[in-house]
Regions:
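A conserved acidic beta->alpha catalytic loop
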Residues: 42-52, 101-102
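Short, well-formed alpha-helical segments that are part of the catalytic scaffolds
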Residues: 16-30, 48
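Short beta-strand/turn micro-motifs composed of small residues
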Residues: 12-14, 42
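Alpha-helix termini
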Residues: 32-33, 57-59, 83-92
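Short beta-strand/loop segment that forms part of the nucleotide-sugar
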Residues: 35-45, 65-66
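Active-site-proximal specificity loops/subdomain of glycosyltransferases
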Residues: 51, 59-77, 87
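Acceptor/aglycone-binding surface of glycosyltransferases and processive sugar-polymer synthases
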Residues: 68-69, 73-83, 93-96, 105-158
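Cell-envelope/extracellular polymer assembly enzymes that use nucleotide-activated donors
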Residues: 7-9, 37
């Protein structure tokens, strides 16, 4: 099968976390079998770079885009989306997922269902809860309040 033969393309950034991304790949394979093509963007991992074996061992087709240096989570996603944009066909859908275990493959069908509505091009998930330390939650709440005071806008995600 080739890129065009898959109905769903998953773009995921990975940085020094082969273990978590391998779990994601296994979950994707179990849930979607041959319908998923993975574009994993290794964001400059030095100690433990991702390789194609991680996908193959999970029974998935895909590519690993190896970046020479760490460019950050958002830029790695943008690079993955750029790769997809040059190859995507009208029947395919793209899902962006973190590879750290926070985003669950079981939510993909619900997201894709949202794209079936007319005039909808993008569906965004809102995380119901984070798995973070109390210290992180406290400082993030302070940041969100400060952001709201300075801009007049609330951050409703994260």
């Amino acid at each position: 099968m080739s890129f065009a033969d898959h109905s769903v393309i998953v773009v995921t950034p990975v940085y020094e976390d082969v273990e978590a991304s391998s779990r994601l790949f296994l979950e994707l394979s179990a849930q979607f079998a041959g319908r998923i093509f993975v574009v994993a963007v290794d964001d400059g991992s030095v100690k433990n770079p991702l390789d194609i074996d991680s996908l193959q061992q999970a029974g998935l087709e895909g590519v690993i885009l190896q970046l020479r240096r760490n460019v950050g989570h958002q830029r790695a996603i943008a690079i993955g989306l750029g790769y997809v944009s040059e190859r995507i066909e009208s029947h395919q859908r793209v899902v962006v997922m973190d590879s750290d275990g926070e985003d669950l493959p079981v939510t993909i069908p619900e997201l894709l269902q949202g794209l079936e509505q007319e005039q909808v091009d993008v569906v965004v998930a809102q995380r119901k809860s984070r798995v973070e330390t109390l210290k992180f939650k406290l400082f993030y709440a302070i940041y969100k309040r400060f952001f709201s005071l300075m801009t007049g806008r609330a951050i409703s995600f994260g």
